[in-house]
């Protein structure tokens, strides 16, 4: 428990505190497709309430109630995020549901950046990269960004793609990758030169939970964010109530240790009510970068 000059005066003898110990998720979907949940009630989990990662996605949650058990006074019912959806080809539909008393974000929906590990023979068209499986395919157009300045480094089409299988080469390629960014290592050949150096970010526009919907939900009581949306495209957030949260919403990308992305586009947010909510954050990257 850290006490500083900034918070010492609000802590008193007899205060009720909770220190969650994060363990496994209550519900975990990995590589699944179109799983539908109706009329589910959850009162506690040592980790995330519901996590879905990888695969086709398109999962649906209808009248999914996750809150502390009635009659209890728990500050936390869940040890991490509530809904955590990542790297799905199709985003989730969450309707008429409730999420509350989490030890992290109530709803977190995101993709994942790719990462340039090195230039092969210092080439600007032949790169060794890290990327989640299936996110980059031959014929796909991808963008490159500087990890620190967010300056745009170019666009190219993938002409060939070869997965690296040598364990020593894989370990060397991953040596300087940011902490929570993981995936397979590939050698790619691009249609044209790009100014992408080692540690550049790759925006591959795939497996970013596109088309997600959060509608008619009640999200409340967390020290952290009601919504954290990192790069999920073509989403709709409407007719929700967000109350008693540290931050109402945060729409951006994360380039630090988590590498959650990529950049948001075509997001509709309408008819939502925020009560006793902190800042509503939007991060954008102007043409040419330099967002910081």
Features from the language model and the residues they span:
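Extracellular parallel beta-helix/beta-solenoid repeat domains
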Residues: 1-292
């Amino acid at each position: 428990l850290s006490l500083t000059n900034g918070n010492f005066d609000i802590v008193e003898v007899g205060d009720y505190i909770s220190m969650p110990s994060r363990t496994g998720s209550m519900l975990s979907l990995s590589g699944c497709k179109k799983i539908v949940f109706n009329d589910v009630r959850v009162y506690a989990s040592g980790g995330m309430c519901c996590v879905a990662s990888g695969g086709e996605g398109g999962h649906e949650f209808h009248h999914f109630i996750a809150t502390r058990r009635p009659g209890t006074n728990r500050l936390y019912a869940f040890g991490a995020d509530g809904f955590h959806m990542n790297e799905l080809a199709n985003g989730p539909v969450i309707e008429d549901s409730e999420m509350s008393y989490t030890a992290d974000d109530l709803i977190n929906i995101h993709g994942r950046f790719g990462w340039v590990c090195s230039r092969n023979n210092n080439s600007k068209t032949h790169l060794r990269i890290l990327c989640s499986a299936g996110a980059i395919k031959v014929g796909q157009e991808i963008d490159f960004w500087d990890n620190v300045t967010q300056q745009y480094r170019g666009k190219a089409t993938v002409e060939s793609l070869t997965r690296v299988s040598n364990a020593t080469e894989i370990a060397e390629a991953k040596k300087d990758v940011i902490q929570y960014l993981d995936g397979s290592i590939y050698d790619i050949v691009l249609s044209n030169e790009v100014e992408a150096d080692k540690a550049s970010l790759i925006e591959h526009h795939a497996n970013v939970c596109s088309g997600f919907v959060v509608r008619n939900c009640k999200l409340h009581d967390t020290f952290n964010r009601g919504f954290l949306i990192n790069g999920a495209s073509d989403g709709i957030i409407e007719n929700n109530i967000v109350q008693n949260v540290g931050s109402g919403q945060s729409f951006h990308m994360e380039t630090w240790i988590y590498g959650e992305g990529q950049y948001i586009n075509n997001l509709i947010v309408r008819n939502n009510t925020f009560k006793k909510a902190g800042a509503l954050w939007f991060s954008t990257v102007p043409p040419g970068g330099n967002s910081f």
